A protein has these predicted regions:
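Eukaryotic gene-expression regulator signature that favors modular helical reader/repeat domains
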Residues: 1-489
């Protein structure tokens, strides 16, 4: 097979994309039997990996990856290609006697590419994951693999400068941005010693922000949060780069960008919300559960203690951001979730942040764009008014300590429009104020509602959405919150 020039990568990709599966099934098999030769070539390797990553079907990927396990997988074709598997555990289970030659061949090929600094290939990352998953923790095999990817500690400035050019640094940075590669890094962090974890995270200096916004890279940060016992060191390595060390407008802007980004928010909300399903999809939860199970024997600190220490490190920056950027945060569901989690879970003085949220919710709630008009805004205000999260097991609200007292702050800003609030889709906010523990304006609120009884009756009798602003399959007659308030009157 003749090695293709770089232009052929574009040509092959364009051909497959324009002509579909038919041409794909002609082109991809041409690479079978040549993987080891191609992956070691400076130009052909990129073509092979591009085809593997972006063109080949799952079965074709399996056939190509199998060639990393030894010459026999390249020479002898699978009788039924549709049943070919690249899962090394399945292959070793079927032929346990082949374990030693397969693992040696795989490790040798992995080492070759790392030493050549050809570490950006998805195929390499998939192969490394298969190798790591089939080692036994604590064995020489597993330890030597960790040594391959863990940078050597540097004791002085000159050594540190040299260390920045180590192949392990280049490898770790590339691994973090693919699915299999990020899992390799996460497992390495989880199984490593405290000293090795520090070296691994140090490799991502000047890359932390990119990790936070990446669909694969952020997992490295979440794993570090879960396994580091030295949270002060972790805060220095990650948070100082992610959001800045000192309070400033630049820091607040960084926090705002993270909080408003679908992936970026995980890096800043995970210490507050943990494994909440609204924050993490099922695929993320599976990876996190894997880490949590392993850390039981590899980390010393209690998980809740670790989490609270991370929350303490983030609290000041997050509260400052809410205090200065409340209006911007209230414009999106992500921003509202950020406000709720931080105000309920952070440490420190929350008064300015609470006042800013209440001020941003002031004004006529009937106006377009007002927080009362959005389901996510209404839910956030309702949660803060209650002063805690609703526990479905006890059917009660678990209040935060010390109390937020948001209901009293909020009422001071919306008193003149409280009847209008009671007639909007966010009417349950007013219901919750009446029911909230420690609300000192109950009599005044009831007085205001009695004055607006006519408006409440009209809202309660009109057909429309429910009190949370959600469309119902069958339209309910009237505003649920307004009805509840009329009953209380």
């Amino acid at each position: 097979m003749v090695y293709a020039a770089p232009v052929w990568k574009v040509y092959l990709r364009a051909n497959v994309e324009s002509r579909g599966a038919e041409i794909r099934d002609v082109i991809v098999p041409e690479f079978y039997g040549h993987v080891k030769r191609l992956i070691n070539h400076p130009e052909a390797s990129w073509i092979l990996d591009d085809i593997y990553r972006g063109v080949a079907s799952s079965q074709q990927k399996a056939i190509l990856l199998r060639e990393w396990y030894g010459p026999e997988f390249a020479i002898f074709k699978t009788a039924d290609p549709s049943k070919a598997t690249a899962e090394l555990s399945s292959i070793l289970k079927e032929s346990p006697e082949k374990r030693k030659p397969i693992m040696e061949h795989l490790k040798h090929l992995i080492n070759q590419l790392i030493q050549k600094k050809m570490t950006g290939f998805t195929m390499l990352h998939d192969a490394m994951l298969q190798y790591f998953l089939n080692t036994t923790p604590g064995t020489e095999e597993a330890s030597s693999f960790l040594e391959i990817i863990t940078p050597t500690p540097a004791s002085n400035k000159e050594q540190k400068e040299e260390a920045d050019n180590e192949p392990e640094i280049d490898l770790l940075k590339n691994l973090a941005f693919t699915s299999s590669g990020s899992r390799v890094v996460c497992l390495a962090l989880t199984y490593s010693s405290a000293k090795e974890r520090k070296q691994i995270i140090r490799a991502y200096k000047d890359t932390i922000e990119a990790l936070a916004f990446d669909p694969n890279g952020h997992r490295v940060l979440l794993t570090a949060y879960d396994v580091f016992d030295d949270t002060r060191q972790l805060s220095t390595s990650i948070f100082n780069e992610l959001i800045g060390k000192d309070a400033s407008e630049a820091q607040q802007q960084k926090v705002l960008e993270l909080a408003s980004h679908g992936t970026g928010r995980l890096a800043i909300l995970y210490p507050f919300a943990g494994t909440a399903k609204w924050l993490l999809p099922d695929t993320e939860l599976v990876r996190i559960e894997e880490v949590h199970k392993i850390r039981e024997t590899t980390s010393k600190k209690e998980p809740e203690t670790r989490r609270l220490e991370l929350v303490k490190s983030l609290s000041s920056a997050c509260l400052d951001t809410i205090a200065s950027q409340a209006e911007s945060l209230l414009q999106s569901s992500f921003g509202c979730q950020f406000i709720s989690e931080v105000l309920l879970g952070s440490e420190g003085d929350k008064s300015q942040a609470l006042a800013s949220v209440a001020e941003a919710a002031a004004g006529d709630p009937k106006e377009e764009g007002h927080v009362a008009q959005s389901p996510f805004g209404g839910r956030m205000i309702k949660t803060l008014v209650l002063g805690g999260r609703f526990d479905p097991k006890t059917k009660k609200v678990t209040l935060v300590q010390p109390p937020l007292d948001f209901h009293n702050i909020f009422y001071g800003r919306v008193k003149d429009h409280v009847v209008d609030w009671a007639c909007t889709a966010s009417s349950l906010v007013v219901v919750n104020m009446l029911e909230a523990e420690g609300f000192s304006h109950k009599d005044d609120l009831l007085k205001q509602l009695k004055k607006g009884k006519k408006s409440l009756s009209q809202a309660a009798s009109e057909a429309g959405a429910d009190a949370n602003g959600k469309k119902q399959k069958k339209k309910a007659p009237g505003n649920v919150g307004a009805k509840m308030l009329l009953e209380k009157l």
